[in-house]
């Protein structure tokens, strides 16, 4: 990661030790993560990798909250940069993020959006491995005293008042190397199980799914590439 970011001198890089959910005891997880609300919201238990990921992102958000910065770029350590980040200067990042409106700006793909533009407004998105977030958004997410969902539950955060923007075409992808594939955060665990949700939540979850299908049908979905060891292998 250090070598990857060294070419971008405009970034002031700070590394944060991730929280490994696999090393946490059941008591530690119960103390820091709301398992009951998680089941009602997602209809399933999160695995330890997902819990550790959610707690790690909150740790990064607290760093931003306690700093004097207006916003920060959060990158996970297994990403591949597929477009030159020096191009960010042409997107008006300061204008987008230097605001009291809770805002995130995704550099990743896998998002649904309304109107085609260089910077789009998202309906929903998947992934939390590369995004700008401003102080207001960090405060908004941290206002959930005890987390109960995944780090990239952007739709829930949007319902709380978060504005989700994204750069199109996207700039950063998750690197599907063998270390990631064998990690505790695996694709088969993503999503939710309506059968085990609260009834209200289960019913309401159908509407966003329909909207996303329609947006994808009309070409308003930014599909991501597949990257293996830093090389694009398909889409």
Predicted ranges, named:
Residues 1-75, 79-235:
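An acidic/histidine-cluster motif and surrounding catalytic segment
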């Amino acid at each position: 990661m250090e070598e990857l970011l060294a070419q971008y001198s405009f970034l002031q890089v700070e590394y944060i030790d991730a929280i490994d959910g696999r090393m946490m005891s059941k008591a530690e997880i119960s103390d820091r993560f709301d398992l009951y609300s998680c089941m009602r919201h997602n209809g399933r238990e999160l695995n330890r990798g997902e819990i550790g990921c959610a707690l790690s992102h909150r740790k990064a958000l607290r760093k931003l909250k306690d700093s004097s910065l207006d916003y920060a770029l959060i990158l996970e350590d297994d990403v591949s940069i597929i477009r030159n980040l020096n191009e960010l200067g042409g997107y008006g990042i300061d204008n987008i993020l230097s605001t009291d409106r809770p805002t995130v700006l995704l550099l990743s793909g896998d998002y649904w959006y309304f109107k085609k533009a260089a910077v789009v407004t998202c309906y929903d998105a998947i992934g939390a491995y590369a995004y700008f977030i401003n102080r207001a958004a960090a405060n908004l997410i941290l206002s959930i005293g005890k987390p109960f969902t995944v780090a990239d539950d952007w739709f829930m955060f949007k319902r709380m008042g978060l504005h989700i923007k994204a750069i199109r075409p996207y700039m950063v992808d998750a690197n599907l190397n063998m270390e990631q594939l064998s990690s505790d955060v695996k694709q088969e665990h993503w999503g939710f199980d309506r059968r085990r949700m609260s009834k209200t939540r289960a019913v309401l979850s159908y509407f966003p799914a329909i909207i996303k299908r329609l947006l994808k049908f009309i070409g308003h979905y930014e599909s991501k590439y597949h990257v293996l060891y830093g090389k694009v292998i398909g889409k």
